[in-house]
Amino acid sequence: MEKEIIITTTETVPQREVAEILGVVFGNTVRAKHVGKDILAGLKNIVGGEIEEYTEMLRDARMEALNRMIKEAKKLGADAVVNVRFTTSQTMAGAAELLAYGTAVRLR
């Protein structure tokens, strides 16, 4: 059974002490828009409301980036990743990168 690690946006883990900082870990994914979904999204943009196709795409991208970051932390033998953050950037027309990063640590 694979060990679960703690993922938190805070700098500390309650009731635990950082024994060792292992370094920055990250996971990323680049996603492109589907032409058909882009047309539907454009129509929704005219009338207003949530663009569900993009919401779903970004949710999936966040999870993929987070899972890749966790995989890197496990390779280092981390017990936790603290100070986790997400960022996005446009890599080219119609495509965006989602990056998850944090500090891998061992806990006492």
Curated annotation (Swiss-Prot):
Q: List the disulfide bonds.
A: none
Give me the segments passing through the membrane: none
- Superkingdom assignment: Archaea
Quote the protein name from its UniProt record. UPF0145 protein AF_0869
What family, per the record? Belongs to the UPF0145 family.
Return the Pfam families for the record.
YbjQ_1
